[in-house]
Design a protein with these regions (language model features):
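Short acidic (Asp/Glu) and glycine-rich catalytic loops that position anionic groups and cofactors
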Residues: 21, 196, 288-293, 304-306, ...
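Generic secondary-structure signature for well-ordered alpha-helical cores
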Residues: 170, 199, 221, 225, ...
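Short, conserved catalytic/metal-binding motifs centered on acidic residues
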Residues: 42, 57, 81, 85, ...
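Dynamic "connector" segments at or just before major functional cores
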Residues: 1-119, 128, 140-152, 166, ...
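Polybasic low-complexity intrinsically disordered regions
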Residues: 107-180, 186-199
Length: 388
């Protein structure tokens, strides 16, 4: 059987296409009609150009078969059926290898600077709910400001995030990175792991660390009784504030930091504690909502200003407008029915790669705008996956 493989070297070594071609294929060569790298790059191309579902991807490729043959330098014009994409993603792709390749590829993109924030967070793939009672649950390490996933693993559920998080972070280069997660991840051992790997952490103190939360809260309470012989000792508080308008409300965030508890609180590498007040006013009703949270960080006062710390925390809380929104709404991840758990995980990983490619090109105002452009210019989409 004549296989639909490439007949010439048309790739830059560091391109996404080259990375996909490097993945191992467990199928025997006899009877293998389509290479794994070819299938994956066709999925990525179709997604760049606006397709989300496997049937739509297959039709998009079929209608552009002559273009695909020319660009990919294939031997034959016949393109895969949508069931072929599903079968290969569910049965042939090695998820761990695909995740590692994705990590290596995205880490090579120019997203990084000093003290870049890496967030850890879990997500249910609702499109896989038929595959299991709770659907596929993924734990990701990602860049909130970009919505880019660096590493993602499947876990049993939210309760499995704590043991899985160290494994995810171990696969990353944490030097010059600042790791943040929700209160579930405020754990001593992961704090040690992060700092020993050259990174820093920002944690929220809530119900799972009640004593830490109470100690920090009391520190920021106004002094009501003098200390015998000392009166009211001075505190080293520094404050930053930002006000933003949008989504029908005015929101003011006020962050106050202190370094004076670092020698009193029993937490590894703790340098500063903080209080964050959020006050929002509804433009329509005038309703006022206030929230106060407490946390701590391993970052020194000289390494980060209160305003910079405030913005990092806000960046983390922007996940719904970053990673989750882009994948759920723009790439329709939660609306794409996938009755096999492994298929859902593979598609999520490819979505991460698509977002990484699109976000590495800053000339597009939004992800939908970029996809509309590539829909009209598929040859440019091919350049994106085949060139550095």
């Amino acid at each position: 059987m004549e296989s639909n493989t490439q007949v010439g070297n048309i790739l830059d070594v560091g391109s996404l296409y080259a990375h996909l071609q490097s993945l191992s294929d467990k199928r025997k060569r006899r009877g293998r009609r389509y290479s794994l790298g070819m299938i994956l790059v066709l999925v990525v191309l179709a997604k760049l150009c606006g397709e989300n579902h496997m049937s739509g991807i297959a039709e998009w490729v079929k209608h552009r078969s002559e273009m695909m043959v020319e660009m990919l330098q294939l031997k034959r014009k016949q393109m895969p059926h949508h069931s072929t994409y599903r079968r290969i993603l569910a049965e042939v792709v090695k998820i761990e290898e695909l995740e590692q390749m994705s990590n290596e590829f995205l880490s090579g993109k120019k997203f990084f600077g000093k003290q870049v924030l890496v967030a850890i967070d879990g997500k249910v793939l609702r499109g896989t709910l038929d595959a299991g009672q709770n659907g596929t649950y993924l734990l990701a390490a990602y860049l909130p400001s970009e919505g880019i996933v660096l590493m993602e693993v499947a876990i049993e559920g939210k309760g499995s995030e704590i043991p899985a998080a160290p494994k995810v972070l171990k696969s990353l280069d944490l030097r010059d990175k600042v790791v943040m997660g929700d209160a579930l991840h405020t754990q001593r051992q992961i704090s040690i792991q992060i700092v020993m790997a050259g990174g820093e952490y920002i944690w929220i103190a809530k119900g799972n660390q009640p004593q830490m939360e109470e100690d920090i809260r009391l520190w920021f309470e106004p002094d009501v009784q003098p200390i015998p012989g000392l009166g009211f000792p001075p505190k080293d508080f520094e404050t930053a504030q930002e006000t933003n308008k949008g989504h029908g409300r005015i929101e003011t965030r006020t962050l106050t930091v202190s370094s004076q508890l670092k020698d009193f609180l029993d937490w590894p590498f703790l340098e500063q504690v903080f209080q964050l007040r959020r006050r929002s006013i509804s433009n329509r009703t005038g309703e006022i909502r206030e929230q106060v949270v407490y946390g701590f960080t391993s970052l020194l006062r000289k390494e980060i200003t209160p305003l910079q710390l405030l913005r990092k925390i806000r960046s983390y809380w922007g996940i719904e407008n970053g990673l989750h929104y882009r994948r759920d709404v723009t790439l329709r991840e939660d609306y794409t029915r996938m009755t096999q758990v492994k298929l859902g995980h593979a598609v999520a990983c490819l979505n991460n790669l698509v977002l990484g490619l699109l976000l590495s090109k800053h000339k597009y105002r939004t992800i939908p705008a970029a996809r509309r452009y590539f829909s009209a210019h598929p040859a440019d989409a091919f350049q994106l996956v085949s060139r550095l």
